[in-house]
Curated annotation (Swiss-Prot):
Highest classification ranks of the organism: Eukaryota, Metazoa, Chordata, Craniata, Vertebrata
Any GO BP annotation: negative regulation of N-terminal protein palmitoylation
PANTHER family: ACYLTRANSFERASE, PROTEIN-CYSTEINE N-PALMITOYLTRANSFERASE HHAT-LIKE PROTEIN
GO cellular component terms given for this protein: endoplasmic reticulum; endoplasmic reticulum membrane; perinuclear region of cytoplasm
Pfam family, one: MBOAT
Name by which UniProt lists this protein: Protein-cysteine N-palmitoyltransferase HHAT-like protein
InterPro entries reported in the protein's UniProt record: MB_O-acyltransferase (IPR051085), MBOAT_fam (IPR004299)
Keyword entries, A-Z: Endoplasmic reticulum, Membrane, Transmembrane, Transmembrane helix
Gene from which the chain derives: HHATL
Keyword Transmembrane among record annotations: yes
Membrane topology: Multi-pass membrane protein
Length: 504
């Protein structure tokens, strides 16, 4: 079935009406549950005073989000504003030294935040992978990179290396793991690109400029070295038409998203409710499904805000960073499921595509996904819940290929060929709806807890069968059809754009 297959406008209107009504109904259930549970003893630690003048408390269960926009807000603004200011001055006065300014400012910021010994620790890892790159053996560079990453994820080395951080503060562990892990991935990218292009003679200075670019340092996203080096080496970068307007719009959207999350957390305690399973079990089925869905949406919003702020600064520096992740609402295939495009690009370039090739053969695809999720497990930090998450998502990615091969099998292919293109789209959307909930359940394991995931699965699939199960499946089907319609519109717009660009 082609992506350009259209459905009747009345049918799409019905889907929109059903989806809007279902979301409103689930939202009302969550709002009532949040109001009822605001004063529960189990909520005292994570539901704190908020808008007292209207009697609303605030969900503060996400430690990182609260720290970013309270105690560390001014530090973040000061550090990024200083970076933008010095970058602008350097671009005006000495554009050839622009990349050096990025590295020096970033290194000083890291040293001021984490201490000089931590900076020396990272320099040691950088030098180690630089030396490995001189040998020109990709397998050695990747192996050493993974060993370095493991040293930041497993005891006793992680405990020893964390001792290099000076002082103690709230976000110390988050910054330590973020800065260290991203440093290893960047250094590994540098080493692999050096092996792939020995004629370019990359230097240690190039690696340091790449690694200590402050906006990307602690939280990413990660750009592969070849892309970063090509963009940052432009002596006189030129902005595209309308680029500044796009940067301002991106910054504005980030501010709006931050305000929206703040407002949302005063009315919906979506992060706190799952911690009290007895209370969560009393929710209506629709509200429970909405709670599971909203947990993934929030994680996407959190990533989009983080990368939106960082990418705004990077765009001011004339870089083209990885875009924020695709909204979870638009994901109904495992192949597009990722919450960090930078890490996804890194894994695809150096592992997944290298092993899987065209991703059309079952055995190479299985090997590629196993290798990719093995590295992802190491990146996230090996533990039981991460093992389970990796297994489920690895299975989901391969299961999609198996189903695709099955659909291409003679009898099934002939059955689909006998259907109209509209009916084929409807059948595929039905499978997409089931896949959508598989994505939610598989990722809810790591974003929340295994017990909460078991509760959702039991209520929606067992005790709620068939009424709840089929109702939620139909609502999801409506959503998938609307996503497909959006994809169809974008494909047509892209085709028209390409036609206009063709010489007459």
């Amino acid at each position: 079935m082609g992506i350009k297959t259209a459905l009747p406008a009345a049918e799409l209107g019905l889907y929109s009406l059903v989806l809007s009504g279902a979301l409103a109904y689930a939202g009302r259930g969550l709002l009532e549950a949040s109001q009822d549970g605001a004063h529960r003893k189990a909520f005292r630690e994570s539901v704190r005073p908020g808008w007292e003048y209207i009697g609303r408390k605030m969900d503060v269960a996400d430690f990182e989000w609260v720290m970013w926009f309270t105690s560390f807000r001014n530090v973040i603004i000061f550090a990024l504003s200083g970076h933008v200011l010095f970058a602008k001055l350097c671009t005006m006065v000495a554009p050839k030294l622009r990349s050096w300014m990025y590295a020096v400012y970033g290194a000083l910021a890291v040293m001021g935040t984490m201490g000089p010994w931590y900076l020396l620790l990272l320099l040691g890892h950088c030098v180690g992978l630089y030396v490995a790159s001189l040998l020109g053996q990709p397998w050695l560079c990747l192996g050493l990179g993974l060993a370095s990453l493991a040293s930041f994820k497993m005891d006793p080395l992680i405990s020893w290396q964390s001792g290099f951080v000076t002082g103690t503060f709230d976000l110390q562990e988050v910054l330590f793991h973020g800065g260290s892990s991203f440093t290893v991935l960047r250094c590994t990218s540098f080493a692999l690109e050096s092996c792939a292009h020995p004629d370019r003679h990359y230097s240690l200075a190039d690696l340091l400029k790449y690694n200590f670019y402050l906006p990307f340092f602690f939280f990413g996203p990660i750009m592969t070295f070849d892309r970063f080096h090509a963009q940052v080496s432009q002596v006189e970068p030129v902005r595209r038409e309308g680029e500044l307007w796009h940067i301002r719009a991106q910054a504005g959207l980030s501010v709006v998203a931050i305000m929206a999350v703040d407002i949302f957390f005063h009315f919906f305690y979506i992060l706190t409710i799952p911690s009290d399973l007895k209370f969560a079990n009393r929710l209506p089925d629709s509200a429970l499904a909405g709670l599971a869905y909203s947990n993934l949406v929030y994680d996407w919003v959190k990533a989009a805000v983080l990368f939106g702020v960082v990418n705004t600064v990077a765009c001011l520096d004339h870089l083209d960073p990885p875009q924020p992740p695709k909204c979870i609402t638009a994901l109904y295939v495992f192949a597009e499921t990722h919450f960090d495009r930078g890490i996804n690009d890194w894994l695809c370039k150096y592992v997944y595509n290298h092993i899987g090739g065209e991703h059309s053969a079952v055995i190479p695809e299985l090997a590629a996904t196993v290798a990719t999720f093995a590295i992802t497990t190491l990146w996230l930090g090996p533990c039981d819940i991460v093992y389970l998450w990796s297994f489920l998502n690895c299975f989901g990615l391969n299961f999609e290929l198996w189903m695709q091969k099955l659909a291409e099998w003679g009898p099934l292919a002939r059955i689909e060929a006998s259907l109209s293109v509209q009916m084929s789209r409807r059948v595929r959307a039905l499978f997409g709806a089931m896949n959508f909930w598989a994505i939610i359940m598989y990722n809810l394991v790591s974003l929340n807890s295994l017990k909460f995931t078991e509760l959702v699965a039991r209520r929606l699939l067992l005790t709620g069968f068939p009424q709840t199960t089929l109702s939620i499946l139909f609502v999801t089907y409506c959503g998938v059809q609307l996503v497909k319609e959006r994809e169809r519109t974008l494909a047509l717009e892209e085709e028209q754009k390409q036609d206009k660009e063709k010489p007459e």
